[in-house]
Amino acid sequence: MNNSINHKFHHISRAEYQELLAVSRGDAVADYIIDNVSILDLINGGEISGPIVIKGRYIAGVGAEYADAPALQRIDARGATAVPGFIDAHLHIESSMMTPVTFETATLPRGLTTVICDPHEIVNVMGEAGFAWFARCAEQARQNQYLQVSSCVPALEGCDVNGASFTLEQMLAWRDHPQVTGLAEMMDYPGVISGQNALLDKLDAFRHLTLDGHCPGLGGKELNAYITAGIENCHESYQLEEGRRKLQLGMSLMIREGSAARNLNALAPLINEFNSPQCMLCTDDRNPWEIAHEGHIDALIRRLIEQHNVPLHVAYRVASWSTARHFGLNHLGLLAPGKQADIVLLSDARKVTVQQVLVKGEPIDAQTLQAEESARLAQSAPPYGNTIARQPVSASDFALQFTPGKRYRVIDVIHNELITHSHSSVYSENGFDRDDVSFIAVLERYGQRLAPACGLLGGFGLNEGALAATVSHDSHNIVVIGRSAEEMALAVNQVIQDGGGLCVVRNGQVQSHLPLPIAGLMSTDTAQLLAEQIDALKAAARECGPLPDEPFIQMAFLSLPVIPALKLTSQGLFDGEKFAFTTLEVTE
């Protein structure tokens, strides 16, 4: 854990220090004073009464001794509880289908003042140009948007076709950028454990920063070896004892609650007063509909308090201070003198009802963010351009031949989990011996002209129609699920025509589709319009059967080989436990 003060992230000039000290001493006028407020004490528990004094970007003082201090402006908190701004410890903004600018507009008014982002989705499509755009967005954002340098592009060498590489030389060019906090999730954990030099070179290059992990279900000597390599955290834990063991071995535990991977209920019982400095909250992948209707990190805090009886100061601690401390962002995470004034005022701390947000010492106005969004997006120079180098397909591209009496592998979906099971089904003249089997195909979209990789999918709930998307982790090829080859082809051709996006087909017609013009991953629409479009897509998808809560996000992970057990990439069926390709027909 990175506990030392990292001056890379704490930019304050000597002149600012002198002004801040003068206000702290009571010798100068504050910019803002927040009155009639209680401050939740994340260290000791309980509350501190008294004003919060702000000068520039920083807190100059806290407590009753500043009751009569002068200020240019006073903010009446009306009895609110003040907590530090919320921090998401690990996410891919691209999974929200929003640009970083739109994401800020949607989440900053909810108290999310800081994000630790790995932009490996767009980097897999566009390479360094995608990372550079995220850096430009971070530089101009009010929200603290920090970046972890994507470490595994593609996720696993030789297992899929992606759009670009991101070499160590390119990675090093970004290491000293002021918004870079470390190395993003090291997904090739077998390579790390076996000591592959190319991976150890990456870890060594970023060892003075924070090294993110990714090791679902890992245990025993393999987990020990992975941690020995220097990996500091993991967001992929999905079982209680798995999370406990990682904490015991010195890892920090990121408790994830996204739109597809929902691990909070399993892991929340671990959190206590002792280990909470080692526990953090993250969303990883959360779509705009859930952000609009349920919230972001605020929703996770609410559930910790209401459903798991986590004490207030502990719930807010894991949502702010623990993460700031882990990433060496020592100017964040507490409402204390000298810390950055990222403040969330809550009218109800138990329900996480946000009354007002300040970031870097300035109050946030949601309407102003919305009004400025278009101009700020243009200023960031988004990397527009069609990234779909694929010709239209026909139903014959998805034709599979099955032999009666033979057994075939089936990717079995677990609703609201990223892991799958590997099962099999026997084919007869009447079809498969289970009625929930659909067809799945992955089509590379980067001009390699490969035939579609085809397989079988169980448990997804698709009774009719087809779903297609260019959001498919991490290479973001075209993934399609369907009950008929004709409808699969129709869905794929719609997303090709859109230059990337999502599509639902039923009754031989496109029922709903959403173009994603930036890298086939992100929309340029407002958060509200995007949420409405997602609502329409989900409604159309529900007509196809009892699908997962977030069918497109769940579908997006069916091609990610670094999460077990059975996945389908553009190269074929991949056994995520043996880390090797396998065949559709079971022959052993």
UniProtKB/Swiss-Prot annotation:
Necessary cofactors: Mn(2+)
Keywords in alphabetical order: Hydrolase, Manganese
CDD domains membership: AdeC (cd01295)
One Pfam family matching this protein: Adenine_deam_C
Similarity comment text for this entry: Belongs to the metallo-dependent hydrolases superfamily. Adenine deaminase family.
Subunit (UniProt): Homodimer.
Protein name per its UniProtKB record: Adenine deaminase
Source organism of the structure: Escherichia coli (strain SE11)
